[in-house]
């Protein structure tokens, strides 16, 4: 068997991102064969990922990537906020975003097979799991390709926004930040679904009917509230966050700009997190 040197262990650690002891054990098992040791670690990484697959991953970050007229946002989840800040996990999110942008995969399953800088996204994910010891999942992504421009905004990596727009670069940045702050549901009022409008109309009609006013007045009250609702939830109707005296629609008109589409991800949005009652756990332990 070839001698296992410190340099071999160090080189394997650099290649895999795993710990020194794991790398040394793999080299011993492979009898000093570097390629075989690397393969052993990849297999073990996959096994570790499978064992952790059922564990809830509700923390994480948003990764982004923009190249010319193509941009992508990706939500990647882990189990704790501590791991979400680790460079290895951040690298996974960035690699996933780049893969989405360059390959335009159909879904998360297809994304796993995309190769970035010589490695499949799934291999990068499994290596990160093996190194950091937490379950990690790529939850969702969005990709825009446009003849206009793409702007992204990340707020603490917990909120991510991507905007497909035309106009000055600063306008794109400002609109992306505005979306993160004001959270519109769509660009314009014609994009609000009929189902949403019907639901709001029912609520406002019931509220207005309680006023006891004539039917024609009630109808006007309902329409007024619907118009206010549309202004509150649409990007164009909202007061611009950096200058509330103007709407986003007016800002865009002044800058000869337009917004075709936007998307926003919030980490963990819609994932039911387990609430741990530590006081109850301590009390239960004390009774043992």
UniProtKB/Swiss-Prot annotation:
Q: Where is this region: Involved in Mg(2+) ion dislocation from EF-Tu?
A: 80-83
Tell me the compartments it is located in. Cytoplasm
CDD domains, alphabetized: UBA_EF-Ts (cd14275)
Q: Record's InterPro entries? A: EF-Ts_dimer_sf (IPR036402), Transl_elong_EFTs/EF1B (IPR001816), Transl_elong_EFTs/EF1B_dimer (IPR014039), Transl_elong_Ts_CS (IPR018101), UBA-like_sf (IPR009060)
Keyword list (alphabetical) reads:
Cytoplasm, Elongation factor, Protein biosynthesis
Give a yes or no for keyword DNA damage in this entry.
no
A GO term from the CC aspect:
cytoplasm
Q: Keyword Cytoplasm on this protein?
A: yes
Molecular function (GO) terms listed? Answer: translation elongation factor activity
Q: List the PROSITE patterns hit by this protein, alphabetically.
A: EF_TS_1, EF_TS_2
Note the Pfam families from the entry: EF_TS
SUPFAM superfamilies in alphabetical order: Elongation factor Ts (EF-Ts), dimerisation domain (SSF54713), UBA-like (SSF46934)
Indicate the principal place this protein occupies in or around the cell. Answer: cytoplasm
The entry's family comment says:
Belongs to the EF-Ts family.
Give a short account of what the protein does: Associates with the EF-Tu.GDP complex and induces the exchange of GDP to GTP. It remains bound to the aminoacyl-tRNA.EF-Tu.GTP complex up to the GTP hydrolysis stage on the ribosome.
Q: Which PANTHER family match?
A: ELONGATION FACTOR TS, ELONGATION FACTOR TS, MITOCHONDRIAL
What protein is this chain from?
Elongation factor Ts
- Name the gene that codes for it: tsf
């Amino acid at each position: 068997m070839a001698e296992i040197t410190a340099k071999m262990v160090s080189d394997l650690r650099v290649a895999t991102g795993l710990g020194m002891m794991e790398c040394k054990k793999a080299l011993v098992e492979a009898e000093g064969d570097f390629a075989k040791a690397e393969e052993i670690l990849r297999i073990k990484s996959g096994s570790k990922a499978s064992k952790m697959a059922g564990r809830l991953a509700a923390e994480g970050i948003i990764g982004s990537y923009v190249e010319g007229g193509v941009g992508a946002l990706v939500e990647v989840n882990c189990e704790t906020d501590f791991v979400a800040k680790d460079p290895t996990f951040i690298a996974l999110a960035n690699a996933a975003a780049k893969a989405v942008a360059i390959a335009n995969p159909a879904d998360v399953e297809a994304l796993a097979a995309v190769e970035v800088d010589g490695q499949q996204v799934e291999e990068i994910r499994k290596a990160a799991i093996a190194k950091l010891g937490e379950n990690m999942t790529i939850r969702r992504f969005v990709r825009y390709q446009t003849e206009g421009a793409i702007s992204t905004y990340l707020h603490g990596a917990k909120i991510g926004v991507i905007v497909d727009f035309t106009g000055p670069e600063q306008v794109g940045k400002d609109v992306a930040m505005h979306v993160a702050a004001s959270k519109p549901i769509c660009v314009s009022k014609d994009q609000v679904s009929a189902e949403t409008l019907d639901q709001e109309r029912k609520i406002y009609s019931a509220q207005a009917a309680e006023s006891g006013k004539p039917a024609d007045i009630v109808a006007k009250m309902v329409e007024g509230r619907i118009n206010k609702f549309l202004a509150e939830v649409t990007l164009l109707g909202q007061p611009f966050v950096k200058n509330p005296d103007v709407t986003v629609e007016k800002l865009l008109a002044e800058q000869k700009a337009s917004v075709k589409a936007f998307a926003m991800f919030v980490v963990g949005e819609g994932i039911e997190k387990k609430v741990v009652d530590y006081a109850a756990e301590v009390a239960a332990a004390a009774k043992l």
